[in-house]
Amino acid sequence: MQKVTFPNKILPYFLLAPQIVLTVVFFFWPASQAIYQSFMMREDAFGLKSTFVELANFTAVLSDPNYLHSVQVTVVFNVLTALLAMGVALLLATAADRVIRGQTFYRTLLIWPYAVAPAVAGMLWLFMFNPAMGTFAYLLRRNGIAWDPLLDGNQAMGLVVVAAAWKQISYNFLFFVAGLQAIPKSLIEAAAIDGARGARRFWTIVFPLLAPTSFFLLVVNTVYAFFDTFGIIHAVTGGGPAKATETLVYNDGFVNLNLGSSSAQSVILMAIVIALTAFQFRFVEKRVHYS
């Protein structure tokens, strides 16, 4: 194998510099500020004076019933969003992989939602399911379903889960299609000759060979549901009704101006995501076969 080197030793660093700057500015700096603020407590409304309070913010957060309820809601939302987004994406990718004519058109059509901003995606679903004027809300009422996510917490949770999953389906679809195309067609044809039907071929041949892709998307969707869905939730329900979909970090930090509590919650969430990702790589990856 031929080794490729840059003619100028400084050039690689220049090429990496923009990404390094973005990572430092939009990840490491905010994370360090959140960790710092989690040990501080503001003494005035303008934040001009703060006091070091050690672990008081973490103790208060972990003993707050509202926070514990928020953790439960977050876990339910995360699991449902990841499963729905990956399940629908796999179904669409399998269908698109069988299409002979117009593959490019269908794939382009299915990846468009990923380009929609989270807040815009939330507003679209809010309009469609608005109890007063939404098209789908009208159809639900015509079929005897008392639809009102502004009053029913379960309906509100279902709506934000569907909206968040819809936004992520396109991303998952791209990777599942790539994974399906990488599977040798000779294996599928051999199984068909042996008499294996479509469902059996999928579960015994296709799905196991998609394990690396599925594992990668499981990690990505977990992080997405934790960190990248605020815009959707805030646009669709605003945290209601009755705190059924409340974004407690936002409310404490930007509404109640309690930066210490908000930062402590952010640090705990970051630790949970890191631990969950490490667990996935440590235990789930053992069941993934890459060859």
Curated annotation (Swiss-Prot):
Its main location: membrane. InterPro entries: MetI-like, MetI-like_sf, UgpAE/MalFG_permease. The keyword Transmembrane helix applies. Keywords: Cell inner membrane, Cell membrane, Membrane, Transmembrane, Transmembrane helix, Transport. It is a multi-pass membrane protein. Residues 67-280 form the ABC transmembrane type-1 domain. GO terms for biological process: transmembrane transport. CDD domains: TM_PBP2 (cd06261). One of its GO terms (cellular component) is plasma membrane. SUPFAM superfamilies: MetI-like (SSF161098). The keyword Transmembrane applies. It is found in: Cell inner membrane. The chain crosses the membrane at residues 10-30, 73-93, 109-129, 156-178, 205-225, 259-279. Part of the ABC transporter complex UgpBAEC involved in sn-glycerol-3-phosphate (G3P) import. Probably responsible for the translocation of the substrate across the membrane. The complex is composed of two ATP-binding proteins (UgpC), two transmembrane proteins (UgpA and UgpE) and a solute-binding protein (UgpB). Belongs to the binding-protein-dependent transport system permease family. This is sn-glycerol-3-phosphate transport system permease protein UgpA.
